[in-house]
């Protein structure tokens, strides 16, 4: 999954997920942000990644599995926790947030 970076915006009422592609020493946005629970972010991300046929199935599965972990954590306990705690729990994810 090192070719891609999962990015998360950690909010009080939503969590947003996006994917960037690693290009050289930087990154390039691959998807827009998808919000949970406002929308079905996981399903939207899945469709977006499936539409990019050059992304391997293994990379798609790894990204979606990590998205599942993030959404589950946010739903179960994370929304009541500061995003810095989530960032410590998932160090491979790029987090920003308001709390």
Curated annotation (Swiss-Prot):
Q: Name one GO cellular component term.
A: ribosome
Q: Establish whether keyword Ribosomal protein is in the entry.
A: yes
What GO molecular function terms would the record report? structural constituent of ribosome
Mind telling me which InterPro entries this protein's record contains?
PSRP-3/Ycf65_sf, Ribosomal_PSRP3/Ycf65
**What biological processes does GO assign it?**
translation
The record's Gene3D superfamilies line, in alphabetical order, gives: 3.30.390.140
> What keywords were assigned to this record?
Ribonucleoprotein, Ribosomal protein
List membrane-spanning regions: none
Describe the function of this protein.
Probably a ribosomal protein or a ribosome-associated protein.
Q: Which NCBIfam families match?
A: PRK02724.1
Q: Which HAMAP family match?
A: Ribosomal_plastid_cS23
Quaternary arrangement and interactors, per the entry?
Answer: Part of the 30S ribosomal subunit.
Which family, according to UniProt?
Belongs to the chloroplast-specific ribosomal protein cS23 family.
| Classification via PANTHER family | 30S RIBOSOMAL PROTEIN 3, CHLOROPLASTIC (PTHR35108), OS04G0461100 PROTEIN (PTHR35108:SF1)
Q: What is this protein called?
A: Probable small ribosomal subunit protein cS23
Q: Which organism is it from?
A: Trichodesmium erythraeum (strain IMS101)
